[in-house]
Amino acid sequence: GLGDVYKRQHEVTGSCHFLQCQDKRILVDCGMEQGPDLYVNQEIPVNASNIDYVFVTHAHIDHSGLLPLLYSHGFRGQIFATTATSELCNIMLKDSAHIQMFEAEWRNRKARRAGLPEVVPLYDMDDAQGVLEHFVPCDYNKIIEICDGVKIRFVDAGHLLGSSSIEVWLTEEDKTVKIVFSGDIGHGNKPLIKNPQFIDEADYVLIESTYGDRIHADPPDYAPELAAVIKRTFARGGNLVIPAFSVGRTQEMLYHLRRIKTEHLLPEFEDFEAYIDSPLAVEATNIFHKSVEDCFSDEAKKLVEQGINPIGFPGLKTSVTSDESKMINFSKKPLVIISASGMCEAGRIRHHLKHNLWRPESTILFVGYQVPGTLGHALLNGAKEVKLFGENIQVHAEILNLPGIS
């Protein structure tokens, strides 16, 4: 039997499918809805303690984000995912728990002042740590016998480091059915990671459709475009602020920035500095470095073999502590600042926006999809004033979107 656990029409819903084979109950993905309200519609409509296995296509929160909630509701089964997905979930689920607790604390201060009921975080750090112990890291392209009647294989989906489509074979009463879960599939030619692999046959295929209504042309060459934006911004004396998801998009931007340096695309500002200001992005970048053999594209592997770090360059700095983060805003020279979260709903990016949105010389460059209702969406749609940390901030900076990168 097969069921879709969530049937809601929202912008980026959490992905979750339910399978039953003989007496085994299985979830494929267990994602959290993304958007401005963390506390709406985030229930798990299955009995968590009855679930035997979870198969995870990739680490993005809309596919993995409710795993700690599943654990807190009693799940103690095994979670199968690729090695890179397991490692990324290790940082992303803990980060998600941290955001939950921070967000709940902030909301509750407001609620207490208004005499309203308090919210409880969906899960805490103990739930995130607990569920991570149930992960079983798997290799690509190997058939794995899960239990009697259930076999799976992870195939590279080319969407994110470690991402996969999952082939599932279910056998009941000598009849075998093959179901393929596409996961999110990359559209090829991404920097760093391999192109999606093909799957030849299946009885049933479930396909993700977040961008299903769009035809993706071949991606443009981003390095020259990015160089032009940096040149224009630095010539004005401003900073280039890039809100970016810590995992995946940040590393892609580092790849393009490295090309700008190595190919001398910005002769006027050859020695420019760039900051990654997100502890999660710094950890994720380290996981990318470890995953060269399994996940990198041939082009990226060649660079590594030549002793070139595909996502590193002179002038790249990382800030992990909040003091280091604050110092960025006291720099006298123009900087490229990559920070999270990508939709500007939380995280250090909000501090950088506070310091740069009012400056006509600065540029805010969006490089990912913006859910309606988020601060990022409002800025892209021409908001003239936004509220940050209780202050009204005028928007005078140049607001740009890098098309086709989503």
Regions found by a protein language model. Name each.
Residues V28-C30, I51-H60, S64-L67, I79-T82, ...:
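Active-site neighborhood of phospho(di)ester-bond hydrolases with catalytic His/Asp-centered motifs
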Residues C21-R25, I143-R153, T171-I179, V395:
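Beta-strand-turn-beta hairpins that frame and shape the catalytic cleft
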